[in-house]
Amino acid sequence: MELALATLGNQPLIAAVEVGKHLTWQLGPLSVHGQTMITTWVVMLLLIGLTFIGTRKLQRVPSGLQNFLEYAYDLLASIARNQIGEKQYRSWVPLIGTIFLFVLFANWLGQLPLRLFHIPEGELASPTNDINTTVALSLIALVSYIYAGLRKSGFGYFKHYFESPILAAVWVLEFFTRPLSLSIRLFGNILAEELVVAVLILLVPILVPVPLMILFLLTGAIQALVFSTLTASYVGEAVEDHDDHH
């Protein structure tokens, strides 16, 4: 789909927003979206760089980037503790934190003027603008909470789900709807935000889109918080019978 803004009559096209067009890379039998891979690498490099710089010279009294990283860790640890429980949360902080920070930076990256960088097909955008990215993140969440249940209870984790046909049906339904809702919620919100900003820039390129871009930075952070909190919540449910927190 292509949205375009042109002058009246036979004047040339002055701007366009492309949706659904992808730069395709062929990796053996697999076809991948090249622009998503590029922006995903950018996000990973940013996270690795910030972590390296922030922890290179640790101080007893933190300041600057170290202070920010410690605050972020405390926030993410509190999310994991509240959702998973005091006894189990520590081993899950790295996963919850990685998901939060990746989704946060991926969402924020989409608010930068990436369309200024031309590629042969499609355009650069947030990695979470691609349904493949959000599905992959959702599958990580799914595998994580199933692993958490198996680690605590073995195959007995599945036992109480099949005590009755109704519980079994509910569990099977949740098995599919949880990752589906996680992926579609994140993908839909980020795609809509970037489209709104892109169209406004086409229509009113000066000043007007700025407040919305600031708002979308906030909503991008909220989406990252929701995704990571729900992941922690699912893990907490998987271990709840073994934790006094529940």
UniProtKB/Swiss-Prot annotation:
InterPro entries: ATP_syn_F0_a_bact/chloroplast (IPR045082), ATP_synth_F0_asu (IPR000568), ATP_synth_F0_asu_AS (IPR023011), F0_ATP_A_sf (IPR035908). GO terms for cellular component: plasma membrane; proton-transporting ATP synthase complex. It is found in: Cell inner membrane. The chain crosses the membrane at residues 34-54, 92-112, 130-150, 155-175, 196-216. Its main location: membrane. It is a multi-pass membrane protein. The keyword Cell inner membrane applies. Keywords: ATP synthesis, Cell inner membrane, Cell membrane, CF(0), Hydrogen ion transport, Ion transport, Membrane, Transmembrane, Transmembrane helix, Transport. The keyword Ion transport applies. Disulfide bonds: none annotated. GO terms for molecular function: proton-transporting ATP synthase activity, rotational mechanism. Pfam families: ATP-synt_A. Belongs to the ATPase A chain family. PANTHER family: ATP SYNTHASE SUBUNIT A, CHLOROPLASTIC (PTHR42823:SF3). Key component of the proton channel; it plays a direct role in the translocation of protons across the membrane. F-type ATPases have 2 components, CF(1) - the catalytic core - and CF(0) - the membrane proton channel. CF(1) has five subunits: alpha(3), beta(3), gamma(1), delta(1), epsilon(1). CF(0) has four main subunits: a, b, b' and c. NCBIfam families: ATP_synt_6_or_A. This is ATP synthase subunit a. It comes from Gloeobacter violaceus (strain ATCC 29082 / PCC 7421). The gene is atpB.
